């Protein structure tokens, strides 16, 4: 029960932050906001300042930003429907941008105490790896992209390699500041017990000491990773690689 309440509260905060983005953008664009509410249901507190009524409501399940002319025609020059297209666009995307910014701030806070980060540096090659050397891979190379997807974090490598893995990957590495394109194919190797297994034959994941700048950099990388996961999920859904049964709404997530 406690976890359900926490989940509901988190969803409420996400929605309230989203609506705050619409509110701030509307105010900045000169659109009249009739009411900005945090929460839903009966009012616990309200105060009118200027043309806007600010409300705090009983149920912590979101909020709303009621703009003039949002749902019906209005003669007010400050109505949403009477604004130029670019102002409408800014107001429309401001909610999602505020959620993105909030996520970035949360990740920055989580990484504030990090002491070190894993990199995408190749640290070791299997002795039988067939593409060693200048024309292949070398320890110290940094994985930059796989199959056209930019690699930011160590976890990205396994994520991207696992998407529709056909046994061959196109990899871009950084070596001495230069980008080098390589095509790798899974090979059959033998472990110390004589058992055969398939692998690409490289080990990655160096360690770098965290600095204030690196904490910000990796916070940005992690946030962009979350955005990419959403994009890839939508692509898989549209392409048929994932079905609607793999999706969950708020109730399923809770």
Question: Where are the language model's segments positioned?
Answer:
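Small-residue-rich helix-interface/hinge motifs
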Residues: 2-75
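PDZ peptide-recognition modules
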Residues: 71-86, 98-254
């Amino acid at each position: 029960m406690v976890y359900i309440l926490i989940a509901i509260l988190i969803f409420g905060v996400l929605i309230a932050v989203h609506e705050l983005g619409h509110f701030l953008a509307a105010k900045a664009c000169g659109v009249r906001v009739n009411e900005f509410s945090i929460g839903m249901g009966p009012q616990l507190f309200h105060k009118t300042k200027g043309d806007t009524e600010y409300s705090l409501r009983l149920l912590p399940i979101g909020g709303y930003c009621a703009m003039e002319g949002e749902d019906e025609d209005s003669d007010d020059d400050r109505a949403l429907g009477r604004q130029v297209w670019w102002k409408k666009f800014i107001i429309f995307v401001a909610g999602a941008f505020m959620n993105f910014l909030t996520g970035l701030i949360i990740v920055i806070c989580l990484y504030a105490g990090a002491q070190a980060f894993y990199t995408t540096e190749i640290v070791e090659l299997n002795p039988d790896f067939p593409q060693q050397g200048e024309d292949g891979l070398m320890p110290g190379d940094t994985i930059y992209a796989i199959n056209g997807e930019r690699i930011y974090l160590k976890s990205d490598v396994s994520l991207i390699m696992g998407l529709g893995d056909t046994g061959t990957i196109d990899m871009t590495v950084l070596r001495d500041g230069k980008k080098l394109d390589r095509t790798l194919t899974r090979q059959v190797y033998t472990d110390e017990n004589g058992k055969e297994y398939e692998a690409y034959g490289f080990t990655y994941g160096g360690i770098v000491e965290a600095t204030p700048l690196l904490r910000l950099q990796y916070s940005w990388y992690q946030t962009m990773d979350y955005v990419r996961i959403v994009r890839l999920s939508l692509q898989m859904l549209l392409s048929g690689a994932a079905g609607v049964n793999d999706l969950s709404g708020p109730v399923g997530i809770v």
